Amino acid sequence: MSELETMRRSALAGFHGGSSAVSLTTAPNAARASLRAYPDAVAALSSALGVSLPTKPKASATGSGITALWLGPEEWLLIGPEGTDFVALAAKANVFHAAVDISHRNIAIMVSGPGAKVAVNSACPHDLTEASFPVGACSRTVFGKMEIVLYRESADTYRVECWRSFADYCFGMLCEGAADAAL
């Protein structure tokens, strides 16, 4: 009898894009979790996860290979190496919280280069100036007709997290923005 083998394939496998001013690449597979918790649980969860959960708007924190993005009061997106079990790690805190694995729901597109800001702003109304959106800033916002989580990793690198079902649309919009950035 033959054996079935499950192979994980990126929703953007084979996609290529960018321009002379912008590089568009699919981020490596990652573990992700949506975390909700009351303020009194933040310290215990931070300790269990190995990263200090940010408590201010647009803030992020990185520790132990994990990045925590503040999405709203009492809500974070956790991103870490593939295989990280955020649900089990958070359970070790022994405090009231909700942690849901969303690793297969999202995909990330890395937008980098001198025209990265222009490419992202082509379909995102967020003010991406250094004063309003410095390195380390993150936000749940819109891009075209979809919701994304935007994270500024460095001066000219943005991580665009979107749902897999919107990956093709998101990548196409970023390709158009990258072309505009090269003009």
Residue ranges of each PLM-predicted region?
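Basic, glycine/lysine-rich polyanion-binding surfaces/domains
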Residues: M1-L183
